[in-house]
């Protein structure tokens, strides 16, 4: 009888991608989660993967049980039932560590840019050579016969330590997740441990001082804009249509590349993809062709229009990510008002980076803040509020509530950049409904 894989917490971005991969490989897959809508479930529904509410009746001793990293005995009935009955299970990252052993695997690690870079690398490689992939926006493709496996490698709680890929990209090292990491030295130590796992090659951003500190058995290739980088981007042109650059490997030009994406960070993401593909011996003309057709990943500078109003949805929830997202918006819309609508994610992160959040939000013309979205792992001790953060921002800033987003209407030709990792999309949906109603009333 064919084994059934049950995913507890299947709507998680990594979990849903892994479930889709196994489903496409012909495995029996099902999963459970809360009944709240999450953007990853659309792909699961389209694939016909059964989605169930959490219930101990979902767990059978013959199932292979894969559990999201956030779930424990005290917050999930399925885990409590499995423990009580002695049913074995693997955490997501433990299962993935074993899964990748059947492929030549390429991880993408970094405090920021993992999902976008994983998506870009997966898009390019899968159009050139048979490649399975797992992207942190909930997208996955699985083929047991694939030569390569591209996946997102997460540093939080050192979840990437079971991974021993042949290659990895490291986009940057930055202090985040203050509920777990003690500081930048702790984060750097985690990346050093991960670097020790890599078998054949590391591709690291050369202008990151902490990445420059790493040592490894595998060769380290640095990429960036400086003369001492192994892979270097030159002749960079950024316009309202995207970005283009020439790529060099140790002084030798390897190609000209155009990326229909915005922001300096996306040029670096593309350069890291070029570096990996060049090292693997893939044809650079093919790489250039498929970079040109990359359309991004879910919730990373995702654009839509409601009438003439531009709305951008982005997962940015760290100061570095907000800065990059607003830079991208400025590149594409240099003559329009940039309106940032930001929901801080977790109280610990908001406390740790309050001044940094205020500084980067000042890159927008006007700022709106949603109430802080607390993590299930923490308690609100009322040490900080969204209004406290608004008071630190120098540009015009105010707090809005989900039941009244009408202040957002006060901007003609505004480009609205909704950012956050919580439920900021609910504010976006409320604003879209308000725009539609306003438009109808004017007709």
UniProtKB/Swiss-Prot annotation:
Its EC number is 6.3.2.8. Disulfide bonds: none annotated. InterPro entries: Mur-like_cat_sf, Mur_ligase_C, Mur_ligase_C_dom_sf, Mur_ligase_cen, Mur_ligase_N, MurCDEF_pg_biosynth, UDP-N-AcMur_Ala_ligase_MurC. ATP binds at residues 110-116. It is found in: Cytoplasm. GO terms for biological process: cell division; cell wall organization; peptidoglycan biosynthetic process; regulation of cell shape. Its main location: cytoplasm. GO terms for molecular function: ATP binding; UDP-N-acetylmuramate-L-alanine ligase activity. One of its GO terms (cellular component) is cytoplasm. It comes from the Bacteria. Keywords: ATP-binding, Cell cycle, Cell division, Cell shape, Cell wall biogenesis/degradation, Cytoplasm, Ligase, Nucleotide-binding, Peptidoglycan synthesis. Pathway: Cell wall biogenesis; peptidoglycan biosynthesis. It catalyses: UDP-N-acetyl-alpha-D-muramate + L-alanine + ATP = UDP-N-acetyl-alpha-D-muramoyl-L-alanine + ADP + phosphate + H(+). Cell wall formation. HAMAP family: MurC. NCBIfam families: murC. Belongs to the MurCDEF family. This is UDP-N-acetylmuramate--L-alanine ligase. It comes from Lactococcus lactis subsp. cremoris (strain MG1363). The gene is murC.
